């Protein structure tokens, strides 16, 4: 890193932001590092909000690092602050209390926020969104009270919360506008398994409908005219990027802050990482909203901030724990030739996806972490496999590559 770089400001005190801050110190950056976050808490990882913090044995949340760690590494924390404007010409940001912070390099790691239902649902105490520790605590209180829960959205958040709510013996109805669960991430085989597993666990699943009205009698009206029990409502219908304060810089696109393979925006000296980054992906650009990407993309950005010029090329990988179900997905698990390994009607199987050259382009595993360990390596290396051998679970995976 050049000698003129003495101040780095990171906006967003979550996993990606904290990873950049500590990564810079590990790589020898001796200048000033300031981490700015809207929440008053020390940075923490958000996956625990829909997992550990809602389970029957829930404990206090876990921070990424202790306050002493930040002090030891001379990382300045500006928590409970919101950035209202970033000035690329003046190389400074303005906080909501009027203070200005100067920077030589600016890292945007502001993440995303839950997409909201229509204005008819705004302000209702029964309606929950899951973004912060306070959100999780409020939802947890309703679940512990045994309230009936209507979940709007059949994605990862909705399914994880459904499993947690059933573990607390809450009646659960899940409402999904599409015709299957997790339709953006997995194929029909995995969606069908998730449907069977959650119904077996007591979840009432409704497809092809939307929430239209919150009724005073503790029910929720649907677009087909029916109603479902809804003493509490959890909304998980996607997210929107936190770009407030950066719109005027012309660094955003339809999905977030646009960056190249080096995490650089079109404005010199301004970078983005984590969920907010609209990054090269599958021939286009888009956000990758996973724990692994927030971690690995941030670590790769550190290399570039230190002057190494290393492009980010890791395949998409995420996991979801839904009660006893461990689902993992790598690469493109919804397109290409489908090879099912194991019994898709059981509770342990894998679905591989191959291109026309028999190269592995994606995989989804259900309760099969060993298969995923191999699949991640194959997807990264674009390994070719024998489809017939791959479909035979009696043949070790290592013997399926060609």
From Swiss-Prot:
Its induction note reads: Induced by p-cumate and repressed by CymR.
Q: Which UniProt keywords apply?
A: Aromatic hydrocarbons catabolism, FAD, Flavoprotein, NAD, Oxidoreductase
What biological-process GO terms show up in the record? catabolic process
- Does the record bear Translocase in its keywords? no
What cofactor does its activity depend on?
Answer: FAD
Q: Which GO terms describe its cellular component?
A: cytoplasm
* Gene Ontology MF terms: ferredoxin-NAD+ reductase activity; oxidoreductase activity, acting on NAD(P)H
Q: What does it catalyze? A: 2 reduced [2Fe-2S]-[ferredoxin] + NAD(+) + H(+) = 2 oxidized [2Fe-2S]-[ferredoxin] + NADH
**Superkingdom in the source lineage:** Bacteria
Q: Which residues bind FAD?
A: 16, 51, 83, 131, 275
Part of which pathway?
Aromatic compound metabolism; p-cumate degradation; acetaldehyde and pyruvate from p-cumate
Among SUPFAM superfamilies, the record links this protein to: FAD/NAD(P)-binding domain (SSF51905), FAD/NAD-linked reductases, dimerisation (C-terminal) domain (SSF55424)
Q: What is its EC number?
A: 1.18.1.3
Provide the function of this protein: Component of the p-cumate 2,3-dioxygenase multicomponent enzyme system which catalyzes the incorporation of both atoms of molecular oxygen into p-cumate to form cis-2,3-dihydroxy-2,3-dihydro-p-cumate. Ferredoxin reductase catalyzes the transfer of electrons from NADH to ferredoxin (CmtAd).
User: What quaternary arrangement does the UniProt entry report?
Assistant: The p-cumate 2,3-dioxygenase multicomponent enzyme system is composed of an electron transfer component and a dioxygenase component (iron sulfur protein (ISP)). The electron transfer component is composed of a ferredoxin reductase (CmtAa) and a ferredoxin (CmtAd), and the dioxygenase component is formed of a large alpha subunit (CmtAb) and a small beta subunit (CmtAc).
Instruction: Tell me which family the UniProt entry assigns to this protein.
Output: Belongs to the FAD-dependent oxidoreductase family.
- The entry's protein name is p-cumate 2,3-dioxygenase system, ferredoxin--NAD(+) reductase component
Organism (species) = Pseudomonas putida
Source species taxonomy: Bacteria, Pseudomonadati, Pseudomonadota, Gammaproteobacteria, Pseudomonadales
Gene expressing this chain: cmtAa
